[in-house]
Amino acid sequence: NPDGSVDMKNMALLMEAAGDTPVTFHRAFDHTSDPFKALEDIISLGCARILTSGCRPTALEGAGLLAELVTKAGERIIIMPGCGVRENNIAEIARLSGAREFHFSARESAGSNMIFRNPEVTMGSEGDPYAIDVTTARRVAATIAPLK
């Protein structure tokens, strides 16, 4: 909503349409004006989890609020930290926040299978136009390893 509250009317419609499918409230949560009111509203809607960086640029920076949300949520909803979660900080985010589920991309740059490459044309951005970011099993394993 324009005032930074959760759009309860449209979320209720979404929840109805989802039926028995678990719904994660995405990082729009990080743009709410009152995260504790938003937490209670989202719980009342029946969402299964909230994906959040703790209203900060990264989950590590938002770990303080994440910890408060995890405590207030209890067993009613899962608080899932996301944004900047990597193998070098996931254990610290877990320790600081008390969260048990995490959202991360575990991506690496991979070359394209394109054989022909036109050196005269770019796709409008810096960097290699023939590279793509892909999630790799190696990075997933490396990211979750510190939690074991």
Predicted regions and their residues:
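Glycine-rich phosphate-binding active-site loops on the catalytic face of alpha/beta enzymes
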Residues: 1-4, 47-60, 97-119
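Alpha-helix-loop-beta-strand connector modules within alpha/beta enzyme cores
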Residues: 5-27, 63-87, 125-148
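Short, well-ordered secondary-structure micro-motifs
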Residues: 6, 34-37, 61-63, 91-92, ...
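Histidine/lysine/aspartate-rich catalytic loop segments that bind and position anionic ligands
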Residues: 10, 14, 20-61
